[in-house]
UniProtKB/Swiss-Prot annotation:
Keywords: Ribonucleoprotein, Ribosomal protein, RNA-binding, rRNA-binding. GO terms for biological process: translation. It comes from Bartonella tribocorum (strain CIP 105476 / IBS 506). One of its GO terms (molecular function) is structural constituent of ribosome. Signal peptide: none annotated. PANTHER family: 50S RIBOSOMAL PROTEIN L21, LARGE RIBOSOMAL SUBUNIT PROTEIN BL21M. This is Large ribosomal subunit protein bL21. Residues 115-143 have a biased composition (Basic and acidic residues). This protein binds to 23S rRNA in the presence of protein L20. Part of the 50S ribosomal subunit. Contacts protein L20. Residues 146-158 have a biased composition (Low complexity). Belongs to the bacterial ribosomal protein bL21 family. Residues 106-158 are annotated as: Disordered.
Length: 158
């Protein structure tokens, strides 16, 4: 069974257990991602073509690594103007291993990662606790009137 998926503005023909390099996908090594933009699913002799995507078709894949490609140099020069500009660029990509191609609402063998929205709210929660800790520290500091009283008591003792 093969499938054609769309990710990163490109289309890839994939089969199960294939290792493929695609444009950067959010996630860490070892995470399982799911692609819902399946344009075509086929087997020997038959194929289902989506309009634009195949309904209830999904592809699950495991992230093997997040890396950057080789450097591409962009060089501009204007002759006789003493003007030149050099820029370098390294494109980020993700290496994936396709786990399985699912049709008709079947469930994946390995659970996919949680949606990004839930992770973002969890990250915001850690910021709130940090702000509360700062607020507690500032509350412990002495006020100006307390400092004057402390200085006055020291001078009376001397």
């Amino acid at each position: 069974m093969f499938a054609v998926i769309k990710t990163g503005g490109k289309q890839y023909r994939i089969v199960a257990n294939q290792v493929v390099k695609v444009e950067k996908v959010i996630g860490n090594a070892g995470d399982v991602v799911e692609f819902n933009d399946v344009l075509m699913v086929g087997q020997e002799g038959s194929a289902v073509i989506g309009t634009p995507v195949v309904a209830d078709a999904r592809v699950t894949a495991e992230i093997l690594e997040q890396a950057r490609g080789r450097k591409v140099i962009a060089f501009k020069k204007r002759r006789r103007q003493n003007s030149k500009r050099t820029r370098g660029h390294r494109q980020e990509f993700t290496t994936l291993r396709v786990l399985e191609i699912l049709m008709g609402g079947s469930k994946p063998k390995k659970a996919a990662a949680k949606p990004i929205k839930e992770e973002a709210t969890a990250a915001k929660g850690t910021k709130d606790t940090a702000v509360e800790k700062k607020a507690e520290k500032t509350a412990e500091k002495k006020t100006a009137s307390q400092k004057k009283a402390a200085v006055a008591s020291k001078s009376k003792k001397d």
